[in-house]
């Protein structure tokens, strides 16, 4: 399951990547596979291991904290099905999109299209108690281990992980970090398509936007934080 998870990451980022399943494979035999082939490899691998994994919450303290469990696999399969039109398109510059109704999966013996598959795996998550939280912010609070929405979170328990807030300062702009009296790396940034998708700059901004991003003018002690060039 972990191998499939990391193949998902690189397929999503790069598209065509080599499929290597043995450390003994000679380097000169490592060649790129089409994105659709990598997609099917990931789906098949996740479906094969799903029934072997415990039906436990990965975001709660205990033996399975931070580990890939069955709900994590179901969540990832739902995500793969939801984006199947993209992942099954090997000629993504030809202007001819794929059709999710014509991309099929076998789930519990049923032949389902991509949209039906996504719903099926989301239903599996709902059956074991996952649901959207009434307060979106709670998912990101310090004590969010009882969130009914979080499925696969970064383990940051203060008693187990000394680097628990690194991801916070890594996401801030250098000047924000300095103005707030802390550190920063300017690592995670939103691109134009992200802010537009959230309605930034319009009268219909997604209510979650301000909870996920620093945007616009940020003030500290009543003074705007400026770029180095003003």
Identify the function of each model-found stretch.
Residues 1-169:
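Structured, solvent-exposed acidic/aromatic patches
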